[in-house]
């Protein structure tokens, strides 16, 4: 079953599609700014999802139990970095492991200069990442921002970084190179 949420909808409410195990695809319009807690929790049949750049917050465990997720599609890395993820299971990357930007699989993530902070849980579980480059414009990395990125081997940090929160790179078991400027 696939669902297209109509244009004009601004919020996907708490538990809106909770435990809809037969749900395989969801189209979310650009009008949506928030996804409520547990909104897609238990949707084990969901295989991919596109999160529009209009989304600014995703509630607690919104994607918990979405074990069939393979791919997450976005169009703006800067907007993704700014989403407020309430917990680790608010990000669909926890299960999907693969992030696509404008259709292309992201393995070497280059954060754009327009970004000043990377939010907590932003890339949690994105095992498809192998390298991350953080520009001078970024001053803070949120808690667990890159936790569980098991494929990540190198991180290059910019000069502007003043704060790296708890667990930012926790469980990045493949990480071998971290470049920090003087």
Model-derived regions, located:
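Acidic, Ser/Thr-rich peripheral helices and adjacent loops at domain boundaries
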Residues: 86-98
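Structural signature of tandem-repeat unit edges
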Residues: 1-11, 21-34, 44-57, 66-83, ...
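Consensus positions within tandem repeat domains that build extended binding/scaffold surfaces
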Residues: 13-18, 36-41, 59-64, 87, ...
